Amino acid sequence: MLAPGGGPEQRSKLVLQWRQVSWITCWIALCAVEVIPACPFSCTCDSRSLEVDCSGLGLTTVPPDVPAATQSLLLLNNKLSALPSWAFANLSNLQRLDLSNNFLDQLPRSIFEDLVNLTELQLRNNSIRTLDRDLLQHSPLLRHLDLSINGLAQLPPGLFDGLLALRSLSLRSNRLQSLDRLTFEPLASLQLLQVGDNPWECDCNLREFKHWLEWFSYRGGRLDQLACTLPKELRGKDMRAVPMEMFNYCSQLEDENNSAGLDAPGPPCTKASPEPPKPKPGAEPEPEPSTACPQKQRYRPVSVRRAIGTVIIAGVVCGIVCIMMVVAAAYGCIYASLMAKYHRELKKRQPLMGDPEGEHEDQKQISSVA
């Protein structure tokens, strides 16, 4: 509403101001559209935490329009079974990725190639059976890795190379039977390791990993449980409680197998020796060198009863020695106290007994005076 008596100049000024305000409002709206990225369909986005939540939507593919500035991407509880190598391309700012509770059976080698700032990776409860050794080489800042509840039977050597910042690793509920110590050597910052609910075979193949576990526990690392499944004598027993002498046979077995392959030079051994040629009539057959392969000794697990018996015998011997030392010390103390008491009583009796030689000299002096 114009004030009464306003002229055309005042009207034109008001119209001009109104146009300026409209232009400024439109410009702000356009800037807001450019700054705030579009959110993928059916997903929930938080512009403050830069989190995109696409969990529980029944997705079979990763949404292609995830904003490049996303720092947290949640894709758990979906139906993802196969992912292309470019599924997370251009998401270099991503720090947290959750792919739990899906149907993934394998991961392309370069699927995490652009995730250089990734610090947390959740792959729990999938169907992953194998992992490429270079899968995590482009994520050196990774701190938390969860591979539990999958079908992993082994870990490729070099899988954890370069993961110096990794603090927690979960390998629970897989099909792991043994682990290589060299695979875990690069994990200098590891604080928590979960390996429970795996069919561990506590034999020679797990000896070196047991050494690494002792070092890991010594520097303050936490381990849930590593219960043996085989051999049956150790079933249910924690690997850390198995005495090291149970693995003494492993070194002997390796030495015997190595020496079997370093015998005197001769023809190469074969599994089935060829039939000797038929001798000529009237000629004596010449003995031929044996080409049979020496049979390697199979690993025979040391009896748990024998190991426990050795420990018990050693404890009994040590106990007897300690008891003998205590008895000897007590006997010495008693003997010393008795001797001290005897000397005290002897000193008390000496003034009462008198000196017979002194009395004899006194009698001589008296007789000479008389």
Swiss-Prot record:
Spans of repeat LRR: 69-90, 93-114, 117-138, 141-162, 165-186
Keywords in alphabetical order: Glycoprotein, Leucine-rich repeat, Membrane, Repeat, Signal, Transmembrane, Transmembrane helix
Intrachain disulfide bonds: none
Extracellular side, ranges: 36-306
Highest taxon listed in the record's lineage: Eukaryota
Key word Membrane present: yes
Pfam families in UniProt: LRR_8, LRRNT
Name assigned to this protein: Leucine-rich repeat and transmembrane domain-containing protein 2
Organism: Mus musculus
Lineage: Eukaryota, Metazoa, Chordata, Craniata, Vertebrata
Gene that produces this protein: Lrtm2
